[in-house]
Amino acid sequence: SFPSALPVKRDANHAAWVTIQIGCDNSCAFCIVPSVRGREISRPYRELVNEVEQLAMEGITEITLLGQNVNSYGRDLTLKLRGTEVSAESSQLVGEAWVRGPHTPRPLFSDLLRSVAEVSGIRRVRYTSPHPKDLRPETIDVMAQVPEVCEHLHLPLQSGSDEVLSAMHRGYTADRYVEKVAAARQQIPDLALSTDIIVGFP
Protein backbone atom coordinates (compact mmCIF):
# COMPACT_ATOMS: atom_id res chain seq x y z
CA SER A 1 0.00 0.00 0.00
CA PHE A 2 1.02 3.61 -0.41
CA PRO A 3 2.93 5.11 2.57
CA SER A 4 0.77 7.15 4.93
CA ALA A 5 3.55 9.69 5.55
CA LEU A 6 5.45 11.44 2.79
CA PRO A 7 8.16 14.12 2.82
CA VAL A 8 6.90 17.57 1.91
CA LYS A 9 9.00 19.74 -0.37
CA ARG A 10 8.30 23.44 -0.84
CA ASP A 11 10.44 25.45 -3.25
CA ALA A 12 8.70 28.64 -2.20
CA ASN A 13 5.53 29.81 -0.48
CA HIS A 14 3.63 29.50 -3.77
CA ALA A 15 4.91 26.10 -5.00
CA ALA A 16 4.72 22.50 -3.80
CA TRP A 17 5.72 19.02 -4.98
CA VAL A 18 3.10 16.28 -4.76
CA THR A 19 4.20 12.64 -4.93
CA ILE A 20 1.78 10.57 -7.04
CA GLN A 21 3.63 7.24 -7.04
CA ILE A 22 6.65 5.48 -5.57
CA GLY A 23 8.83 2.72 -6.97
CA CYS A 24 9.33 1.70 -10.59
CA ASP A 25 8.42 -1.30 -12.76
CA ASN A 26 11.11 -0.64 -15.38
CA SER A 27 14.51 -2.33 -15.41
CA CYS A 28 16.90 0.26 -16.84
CA ALA A 29 20.43 -1.14 -16.60
CA PHE A 30 21.84 2.02 -15.02
CA CYS A 31 19.19 2.55 -12.33
CA ILE A 32 18.80 1.07 -8.83
CA VAL A 33 15.37 2.56 -8.06
CA PRO A 34 13.42 -0.71 -8.54
CA SER A 35 15.90 -2.49 -6.24
CA VAL A 36 15.69 0.02 -3.40
CA ARG A 37 12.12 1.34 -3.75
CA GLY A 38 10.31 -1.69 -5.14
CA ARG A 39 7.46 -1.97 -7.63
CA GLU A 40 5.29 0.97 -8.64
CA ILE A 41 2.58 1.94 -6.19
CA SER A 42 0.15 4.65 -7.25
CA ARG A 43 -1.30 6.99 -4.69
CA PRO A 44 -5.12 6.97 -4.61
CA TYR A 45 -6.58 9.46 -7.08
CA ARG A 46 -9.03 11.16 -4.71
CA GLU A 47 -6.35 11.45 -2.02
CA LEU A 48 -4.13 13.32 -4.48
CA VAL A 49 -6.82 15.74 -5.57
CA ASN A 50 -7.77 16.35 -1.93
CA GLU A 51 -4.16 17.22 -1.11
CA VAL A 52 -3.95 19.69 -3.98
CA GLU A 53 -7.22 21.28 -2.87
CA GLN A 54 -5.80 21.66 0.64
CA LEU A 55 -2.56 23.14 -0.71
CA ALA A 56 -4.55 25.63 -2.78
CA MET A 57 -6.43 26.73 0.35
CA GLU A 58 -3.03 27.33 1.98
CA GLY A 59 -2.03 29.69 -0.82
CA ILE A 60 -0.11 27.31 -3.08
CA THR A 61 -0.58 28.21 -6.76
CA GLU A 62 1.97 25.96 -8.49
CA ILE A 63 2.03 22.17 -8.27
CA THR A 64 4.65 19.72 -9.54
CA LEU A 65 3.43 16.12 -9.75
CA LEU A 66 6.30 13.79 -8.92
CA GLY A 67 6.93 10.14 -9.78
CA GLN A 68 9.63 7.91 -11.23
CA ASN A 69 7.41 7.24 -14.26
CA VAL A 70 4.34 9.44 -14.00
CA ASN A 71 2.81 8.16 -17.25
CA SER A 72 2.30 4.72 -15.74
CA TYR A 73 0.29 6.22 -12.87
CA GLY A 74 -2.67 3.99 -12.00
CA ARG A 75 -1.44 0.85 -13.74
CA ASP A 76 -1.22 -1.01 -10.43
CA LEU A 77 -4.76 0.09 -9.58
CA THR A 78 -5.94 -1.74 -12.70
CA LEU A 79 -4.15 -4.91 -11.60
CA LYS A 80 -5.96 -4.78 -8.27
CA LEU A 81 -9.29 -4.53 -10.05
CA ARG A 82 -8.59 -7.31 -12.55
CA GLY A 83 -10.98 -10.17 -12.02
CA THR A 84 -13.19 -8.05 -9.80
CA GLU A 85 -16.58 -6.66 -10.75
CA VAL A 86 -16.04 -2.91 -10.80
CA SER A 87 -18.47 -1.11 -8.55
CA ALA A 88 -18.49 2.04 -6.46
CA GLU A 89 -17.37 -0.03 -3.48
CA SER A 90 -14.49 -1.79 -5.23
CA SER A 91 -13.40 1.46 -6.86
CA GLN A 92 -13.16 3.18 -3.49
CA LEU A 93 -10.87 0.42 -2.25
CA VAL A 94 -8.23 1.31 -4.83
CA GLY A 95 -8.63 5.05 -4.74
CA GLU A 96 -11.54 5.69 -7.08
CA ALA A 97 -10.19 3.94 -10.14
CA TRP A 98 -13.13 3.99 -12.53
CA VAL A 99 -14.12 2.41 -15.81
CA ARG A 100 -13.73 4.88 -18.68
CA GLY A 101 -14.16 2.00 -21.10
CA PRO A 102 -14.19 -1.80 -20.99
CA HIS A 103 -10.39 -2.02 -21.06
CA THR A 104 -9.37 0.98 -18.94
CA PRO A 105 -10.49 0.46 -15.33
CA ARG A 106 -8.18 3.13 -13.95
CA PRO A 107 -7.55 6.86 -13.97
CA LEU A 108 -4.93 7.73 -16.56
CA PHE A 109 -2.19 10.20 -15.68
CA SER A 110 -3.87 12.63 -18.07
CA ASP A 111 -7.06 12.44 -15.98
CA LEU A 112 -5.11 13.28 -12.85
CA LEU A 113 -3.24 16.09 -14.61
CA ARG A 114 -6.51 17.67 -15.75
CA SER A 115 -8.18 17.30 -12.35
CA VAL A 116 -5.26 18.94 -10.54
CA ALA A 117 -5.25 21.81 -13.03
CA GLU A 118 -8.97 22.34 -12.43
CA VAL A 119 -8.54 22.87 -8.67
CA SER A 120 -9.56 26.42 -7.81
CA GLY A 121 -6.53 28.58 -7.07
CA ILE A 122 -4.00 26.46 -8.95
CA ARG A 123 -2.39 28.49 -11.73
CA ARG A 124 0.46 26.27 -12.92
CA VAL A 125 0.93 22.50 -13.02
CA ARG A 126 4.15 20.70 -13.94
CA TYR A 127 5.20 17.06 -13.76
CA THR A 128 8.32 14.92 -13.72
CA SER A 129 9.39 12.50 -14.96
CA PRO A 130 7.69 10.69 -17.83
CA HIS A 131 9.24 7.66 -19.56
CA PRO A 132 9.33 7.98 -23.37
CA LYS A 133 7.86 4.51 -23.94
CA ASP A 134 4.82 5.33 -21.77
CA LEU A 135 4.14 8.90 -22.90
CA ARG A 136 0.51 8.82 -24.07
CA PRO A 137 -1.25 11.15 -26.54
CA GLU A 138 -3.83 11.92 -23.83
CA THR A 139 -1.15 13.61 -21.74
CA ILE A 140 -0.10 15.83 -24.63
CA ASP A 141 -3.78 16.60 -25.29
CA VAL A 142 -4.18 17.93 -21.75
CA MET A 143 -0.98 19.98 -22.03
CA ALA A 144 -2.29 21.53 -25.25
CA GLN A 145 -5.84 22.13 -24.00
CA VAL A 146 -5.48 23.20 -20.37
CA PRO A 147 -3.76 26.58 -19.88
CA GLU A 148 -2.75 25.84 -16.29
CA VAL A 149 -0.55 22.92 -17.42
CA CYS A 150 2.88 24.25 -18.36
CA GLU A 151 4.06 23.62 -21.91
CA HIS A 152 7.29 22.00 -20.74
CA LEU A 153 8.16 18.36 -21.31
CA HIS A 154 11.17 16.79 -19.61
CA LEU A 155 11.58 13.56 -21.57
CA PRO A 156 14.77 11.62 -20.75
CA LEU A 157 16.42 10.29 -23.92
CA GLN A 158 19.57 8.84 -22.24
CA SER A 159 21.21 7.96 -25.59
CA GLY A 160 20.82 8.60 -29.32
CA SER A 161 22.16 5.13 -30.17
CA ASP A 162 19.67 2.31 -30.59
CA GLU A 163 22.36 -0.19 -29.61
CA VAL A 164 23.01 1.65 -26.36
CA LEU A 165 19.28 2.15 -25.69
CA SER A 166 18.78 -1.59 -26.07
CA ALA A 167 21.65 -2.30 -23.67
CA MET A 168 20.06 0.17 -21.25
CA HIS A 169 16.72 -1.73 -21.49
CA ARG A 170 14.90 1.52 -22.27
CA GLY A 171 12.19 0.01 -24.46
CA TYR A 172 12.28 2.52 -27.34
CA THR A 173 14.47 3.54 -30.27
CA ALA A 174 15.90 6.96 -31.08
CA ASP A 175 13.46 7.26 -34.00
CA ARG A 176 10.52 6.44 -31.74
CA TYR A 177 11.64 9.13 -29.31
CA VAL A 178 11.84 11.68 -32.15
CA GLU A 179 8.36 10.65 -33.34
CA LYS A 180 6.88 11.29 -29.89
CA VAL A 181 8.55 14.69 -29.64
CA ALA A 182 7.36 15.62 -33.15
CA ALA A 183 3.80 14.61 -32.27
CA ALA A 184 3.95 16.73 -29.12
CA ARG A 185 5.32 19.74 -31.01
CA GLN A 186 2.60 19.38 -33.62
CA GLN A 187 0.05 20.07 -30.90
CA ILE A 188 2.21 22.46 -28.86
CA PRO A 189 4.42 24.44 -31.28
CA ASP A 190 6.13 26.37 -28.47
CA LEU A 191 6.80 23.27 -26.37
CA ALA A 192 9.88 23.57 -24.15
CA LEU A 193 11.76 20.27 -24.23
CA SER A 194 14.46 19.15 -21.82
CA THR A 195 16.12 15.77 -21.50
CA ASP A 196 18.77 13.62 -19.80
CA ILE A 197 21.76 12.12 -21.62
CA ILE A 198 24.14 9.53 -20.16
CA VAL A 199 27.68 9.82 -21.55
CA GLY A 200 30.06 6.86 -21.40
CA PHE A 201 27.52 4.08 -20.76
CA PRO A 202 28.33 1.48 -19.51
Language-model regions, residue ranges each:
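Proteins enriched for Cys/Gly/acidic motifs involved in redox and nucleic-acid/cofactor modification
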Residues: 1-73, 82, 86, 108, ...
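Compositionally biased, low-structure terminal segments
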Residues: 3, 92-94, 110
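Alpha-helical interaction segments
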Residues: 7-8, 88, 99, 191
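Short, solvent-exposed loop/turn segments at secondary-structure junctions
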Residues: 72-74, 201-202
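Intrinsic disorder/low-complexity segments
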Residues: 80-106
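Conserved AdoMet/S-adenosylmethionine-binding subsite of the radical SAM
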Residues: 98-202
